[in-house]
């Protein structure tokens, strides 16, 4: 693509930005990136359809993102999700049917890579890597983006999934449901981090426990595993209950601290009920 073409694509995204400025951001967007009716490569669309049929809680959107990367970037600018969950089937050399969840580390792109990505995107080529590259290029990639990827067993024209693809679909749905359920907790932890750094609050049993808990929640966001989270929650709760809190706390601190405990209780109960 020429520099002029790249400029036009950027101008189109900028125009969408102008239209979206007054729109309220959404907390979570589940995006299915798929190649329509291409056997297992259609998995992302099927995940989105299943979630839509089940019904989604307030603030959670699920959409098919099977169109060009520039259009997807424009849609991200409109919705401005705080958390994006991209679901796809993509060949990575893993055993067929394998499903992997990972927290995206945004790529660093040079001008040539951006230009090549936009050139592919305007042709309608669809691939999760391309969606990420274009979103990064136009600076609309959400702060937290999670990838749920299945390894396809069968690719090429065809309706429906292979047996391995069907198993992968169920695994992907389970992982996405977990991500949706954990999103409010992780957003709350993200809000709390800057409030407990530095010396605004005096050290206390509860504050030290909270800092450890937030580190563990960051690990949960990165790796998808609870680790010591609930043991640290109990230590934190005990510190608050025994009034081992910090000098300098205000009403917002108290509200957020107790909200974190309650949110952890909610998520623990929900995941125990749906193992």
Question: Over which residues does each language-model region extend?
Answer:
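A broad detector of the eukaryotic-type serine/threonine protein kinase catalytic domain
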Residues: 153-155, 241
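N-terminal catalytic or cofactor-binding beta/alpha core of small enzyme domains
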Residues: 2-152, 159-171, 177-187
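Soluble extracellular-acting proteins and domains
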Residues: 185-274
